[in-house]
């Protein structure tokens, strides 16, 4: 009897352990989803439209990308230079060039409505990488910028979208715990009724956090400026999100979950601003000794001498699906920018980290499977032994005959 007693206690222990593991696994997955995180602790990019918002139209954006060189001499702002030192918080990119003056001039001319576009790029050596793009239509000049009846999806570079979002003013780019590889020249392009407002900001990341996301920089995604003649978001595999505030909350919760400095209000004062650079700094930044390697008959020169300040074929807010088929240009030889010698190590470490996570997950699943198999086997054996014991102890029926 003692043997069966101990076996029963052991079986109950195995069953309770198995149930605890299953419950913990379910709670862990549910907690990640509730916090807006994936299994690798990276933020989830919300792509669903907010319910009941009839003003959001995905058809407004025709996926056309303007050129980062869209500029005029009338709004040649200085290049702001900021240094990021708060290693586990947010980097705020807010260059010069406020659209409120353009809206004021439209209001003085008696115009009550306007259309607009906001785009962010990171510039390389004679190339540009689109980060963010959003269009607005039927906006009011009496309201702050971005107060519109129609808004397109916010189109994001997938890698930047994991740790970045656009501020509530629709203008500032916020990056959570940036790594050193994100240092560089960024440009923001605002187009209001065809009038461009282009401004640059130079970001220098001096200190990074241990969990800063690496592997965001990719030279293949930095396209030569001739790409933007017919370039679309489809050629770049950009992701569209219709819930910017949910996107913002997911990035903030991700930073707080992994130990970053979560601030209720993200302000620009966290950045150290040094002396501004002239607007001509962009031209010197573009030039590279390797530019001539990519000049051929079929490809427009990547140097700034052969690039005009037109819109590169961009005609503003249109809704012509037939234009989607007019973008056959795909970069065959990407412009290789000058990068640090240590830039390859973050990619390798990221790959090793992901492999380690996969191996750990497989080991945990195998252990859980073994627990389930062992517990099920013991349960079957116990049931079988109970049946045998019951059959042995059951009294046999004897036939009694009358005397």
UniProtKB/Swiss-Prot annotation:
**Membrane spanning segments where?**
358-378
Q: Does the keyword Oxidoreductase apply?
A: no
Whose protein is this, by species?
Answer: Gallid herpesvirus 2 (strain Chicken/Md5/ATCC VR-987) (GaHV-2)
GO cellular component terms? membrane; viral envelope; virion membrane
Q: What spans does the record annotate as topological domain Intravirion, numbered to this chain?
A: 379-403
Q: Where's it found, cell-wise?
A: Virion membrane
Task: List the keywords (alphabetical).
Answer: Disulfide bond, Glycoprotein, Host-virus interaction, Membrane, Signal, Transmembrane, Transmembrane helix, Viral attachment to host cell, Viral attachment to host entry receptor, Viral envelope protein, Virion, Virus entry into host cell
UniProt similarity note: Belongs to the herpesviridae glycoprotein D family.
A single GO BP: symbiont entry into host cell
User: Which named protein is this?
Assistant: Envelope glycoprotein D
Report if keyword Signal is assigned: yes
Superkingdom of the source species: Viruses
Q: State the membrane topology.
A: Single-pass type I membrane protein
Instruction: State which ranges are Virion surface (membrane side).
Output: 35-357
Stated role: Envelope glycoprotein that binds to host cell entry receptors, promoting the virus entry into host cells. May trigger fusion with host membrane, by recruiting the fusion machinery composed of gB and gH/gL.
What cystine pairs are annotated?
88-209, 127-222, 139-148
Query: Which Pfam families does the entry mention?
Result: Herpes_glycop_D
Q: Which residues are glycosylated?
A: 87, 138, 230, 306
**Matching InterPro entries:** Herpes_glycop_dom (IPR002896), Ig-like_dom_sf (IPR036179)
Extract the signal peptide range.
Answer: 1-34
């Amino acid at each position: 009897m003692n043997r069966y007693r101990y076996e029963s206690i052991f079986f109950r222990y195995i069953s309770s352990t198995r149930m605890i593991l299953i419950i913990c696994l379910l709670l862990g997955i549910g907690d990640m989803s509730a916090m807006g995180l994936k299994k690798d602790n990276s933020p989830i990019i919300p792509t669903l439209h907010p319910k009941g918002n009839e003003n959001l139209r995905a058809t407004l954006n025709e996926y056309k990308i303007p050129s980062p060189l869209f500029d005029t001499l009338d709004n040649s702002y200085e290049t702001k230079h900021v240094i990021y030192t708060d290693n586990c918080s947010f980097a705020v990119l807010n260059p010069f060039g406020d659209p409120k003056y353009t809206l004021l001039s439209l209001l003085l001319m008696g115009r009550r409505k306007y259309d607009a576009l906001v785009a962010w790029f990171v510039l390389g050596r004679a190339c540009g990488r689109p980060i963010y793009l959003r269009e607005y239509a039927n906006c009011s000049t009496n309201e702050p910028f971005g107060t519109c009846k129609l808004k397109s999806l916010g189109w994001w570079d997938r890698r930047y979208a994991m740790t970045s979002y656009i501020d509530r003013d629709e203008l500032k780019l916020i990056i959570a715990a940036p790594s050193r590889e994100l240092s560089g020249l960024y440009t923001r392009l605002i187009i209001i009724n065809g009038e461009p407002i282009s401004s640059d900001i130079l970001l220098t990341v001096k200190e990074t956090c241990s969990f800063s996301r690496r592997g965001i920089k990719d030279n293949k995604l930095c396209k030569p400026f001739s790409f933007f003649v017919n370039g679309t978001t489809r050629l770049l595999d950009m992701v569209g999100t219709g819930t910017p505030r949910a996107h913002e909350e997911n990035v903030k919760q991700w930073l707080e979950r992994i130990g970053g400095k979560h601030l209720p209000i993200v302000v620009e004062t966290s950045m150290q601003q040094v002396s501004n650079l002239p607007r001509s700094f962009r031209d010197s930044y573009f030039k590279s000794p390797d530019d001539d390697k990519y000049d051929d008959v079929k490809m427009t020169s990547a140097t700034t001498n052969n690039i005009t300040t037109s819109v590169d074929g961009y005609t503003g807010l249109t809704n012509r699906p037939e234009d989607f088929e007019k973008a056959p240009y795909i970069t065959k030889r990407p412009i290789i920018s000058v990068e640090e010698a240590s830039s390859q190590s973050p990619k390798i470490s990221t790959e090793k980290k992901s492999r380690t996570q996969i191996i750990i997950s497989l080991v945990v699943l195998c252990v859980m499977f073994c627990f389930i198999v062992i517990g099920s086997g013991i349960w079957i054996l116990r049931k079988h032994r109970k049946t045998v014991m019951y059959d042995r102890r059951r009294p046999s029926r004897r036939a009694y005959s009358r005397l």
